Structures are given as C-alpha cells and as structure tokens.
Amino acid sequence: MADNPVYLSVSDLNFYISQKFKNDPYLHKVFLQGELSNFRFRMHSHQYFSLKDDKSKINVVMFRSFFEKLKFKPEEGMKVYVSGYVDVYGPQGSYQFYAQTMEPAGLGALYEQLRQLQEKLAKEGLFNEDHKKRLPLFPDRIAVVTSASGAVIHDIMVTANRRFPHAEIDLYPAKVQGDEAADTIVASLKQIQAQGDKYDVVIIGRGGGSLEDLWPFNEEKVVRQIYAMQMPVISSVGHETDTTLADLVADARAATPTAAAEYATPNLADVLTKIVQLRARLYAAMQANIRAKRQILDRLRKAPVLQEPTRIYDQQIQQVDMLSHRLNQAISNQLQHDRSSVRLLQERLKALNPGRRLEQLERERTFIVANLFSTMTAYLKDQRNKLNRTMQQLDDISPLKTIGRGYVYTTDQEGNTVTSVDKLEIDEKLKLHFKDGQVQVNVENIRREKDGNQEK
C-alpha cells in the first residue's frame, strides 16, 4: 500500500472514466442489436429503456429530437438495430448507451426497398390523383380478391348484402401472405380483367399484420397490375395505420373490409329515401305548373274578347265609318267646289258671251265631274274591299266561327274546360257547348288513344 495515497472524489473518478470513454474511438459510434426491454412510451419527452440479449443488458437513453425522427413505433420485446455512443452518467456513476437511430431488426432492408420502389413508381405517375377512377353508384357485380378462409370476405359480404342486396359478389381466392402471395394476387386480378366489363368494382384486401405479412401488397408486380385495371379498385390492406403501395395506387382506400364494402355499395334505404324526396319535389313542381297554367286559362277565358267576340270588329267598323264619312265629305266638298267653279265660269261667259268657249268648258266640266266621281267611287270600293277582307280574316279566327263549323268544347260540373280523358271518371256529368246551346251528358266509357284498346 502506498505511503501517501491520493484519494479521489467520486465525481473525479466518474469524470476520469467518462474521459476514457470519450477518448476511445471504438465507443464514438457503436452499432447494437438487441431486444427492447422496460420500454414505456413517454409522449413529447426523452425515452428511457434497456436493450438486452440472452446474457446481459444495457441502459439506453434516446433524446426526443432523435426519437421523433423514427418511422415506426417501438414496442416492448421488439428486436431493433440502434446506433449511438457510450458515455458515463456522472450523477449516478453508471454508463449507458445514447441511441441516435433505431429501426426494426430484419426490416431495415425492407423499409429501404419500399422507399426506393415508392419513389420510382411515384415518378412514373402511378399514384397521381388524375388517374383515379370514380366508384360506381349502383354496382351490379363486385369482385373480391382475398383469402377464402379469412374474415375479410365474410365482413364484405355481410355489409354489402345489408346495404345493397342487388349487387352480386364473386370471390377470387388468393394468398395474402408469403412468397407466393404476390403471384396469386396478380393472377386473380388478371382473371378479373379478362372478364371485360362483367365487374363494376374490385375490392382487394386482407387483415392487419407486420411489414413482412403485408409485403405482397408492396410488390411492384401487384402495384402495376392494380394500376392497369379497367374498373375501379378499392384497397383494404392491414389496419388504418398501415399503408402499402397497393393503398397508394388504388382508386380508393378503406381502413377495414367493412368500410371497403360501404365504399363499393350505396345504402339502399338512403337511396329509396332520396327517391321519395325527389318524387315529392317533382310532384309539387308539376302541381305548381298546372295551377299556373289553369290561372292563365282562367284569365283567357274571362277576357272580354272571348266574352263578347263581336267587339273584335268594333274598332275596324268605327274606322270604316269614319273613312266613309271622310270620303263622302271629300266628294261633297269637291262637287261643291266644282259647282262654284262652274258658276264662276258661267258668270264670266255671260259677261263675254263666248258660245263655243262655253260649250268647250261645259264639256270639260262634265268630263272632270265624271272622272272625279269615277275615281272617288273606285277608291271607296277599294276601301270597302279591304274592310271586307279584314273582317273575313277576323271572322276566320273567331272562336265562335270554330263552334259554328260543328266543333264543341266540354266543361265539367265546376265549369272547368276538359282537355284530356286522364282525369275523367265513369258516370261523371259533363256539358257540351254548341253554337246555339249546351247539352249535358254522362261518361259511360273512356277510351285512351295512346294504346287504342284500354277502356275504363
């Protein structure tokens, strides 16, 4: 034992050991694999747990900034790969591992492969929204690609039959897990595609599972076949938190098989309710239109021109009388003027006593009077002819003239005009209107012209 030993403080010793760790290049970046132990998730905080194998364990700290970058959710007992460094925690004098990265053991390569394939297919446009097809409103036949023995097909059939029993569901069995799963899924999709337009929509799916279990739905061949389908495809793979490339390329994604069936089918009860509502709205609109037309008809029926058709000619007759009066007055004025002129000439002739000139003027006077009378008579005749033609045209379009040719119009007991047999009933009393009176009749039978043989 040394004569003068140097006693270190606990802090000094811990600091010394810490410096040893920091100066050791092998401890600057350490890669470990092991099983998560004592893992209790702390939200918005640093994570403290252990990493163990079958012989020993080490305490691990993962600061919040590193933990929030993880692309998966660590769980107790999960085997993981971690990287970081070793250091001493001075206050407790214990060394521990400070983790900076973590990924599931055995899945790191799969995640990297998945990331690269997703980037490749995204660049090709397989996930673009403009390629997505609309789901049919009323599918007649639905094809389902899934395991024949799982609960997926049962949930889909139960939900679809409850919502829309009209739709037929055909199962195309496929392995949904394992090395052969991708090939069987592609084969079933191609078989559906070969049916042409037999199916309106396709549902592809399986229950939840690990990344390895769901891997067939990340296979490139499966993704490309879904993209090539002519009909819409609904993907229901895994749980809501799981996302596969099949989900990204499909036209719609459902969190569960039940949700997939709901996407694919309408709710018949909702459809029937909507039909009833639309039917009521249509009936109300038709009734409103009929009421409006009846109001117009009533106004026309009460119009003075139909109540007293002869009033149509009143203005024309008055105009003819006025023109006749003006014509007669013009003729009278002209004759009076001519007589005055003749008398004036006679006076002048008497003063001059020109015999021959007088005779010539008399002949001119007689000619002028005759020509004027003839012109006025022709003008009056032409005006009367125009008046007669106008009155004839008005008479031709008169409702009374139509009745005069043998036509009648029919009204019911309320005085409404009957225009169709659709609303008539047997033994209903009607009134026929002739030009000179009315006749009351009873309906004995009804014959519709549209089918020629239906009688009521």
Swiss-Prot record:
The catalytic activity, as recorded, is: Exonucleolytic cleavage in either 5'- to 3'- or 3'- to 5'-direction to yield nucleoside 5'-phosphates
**Is Plastid among the key words of this record?**
no
The cellular component terms of Gene Ontology attached to this UniProt record, alphabetical and capped at eight, are: cytoplasm; exodeoxyribonuclease VII complex
Pfam families on file: Exonuc_VII_L (PF02601), tRNA_anti_2 (PF13742)
A Gene Ontology molecular function term for this protein is:
nucleic acid binding
> What family classification does the UniProt entry report for this protein?
Belongs to the XseA family.
Assembly, in brief, is: Heterooligomer composed of large and small subunits.
Q: What is this protein called?
A: Exodeoxyribonuclease 7 large subunit
Species whose genome carries this gene? Lactobacillus gasseri (strain ATCC 33323 / DSM 20243 / BCRC 14619 / CIP 102991 / JCM 1131 / KCTC 3163 / NCIMB 11718 / NCTC 13722 / AM63)
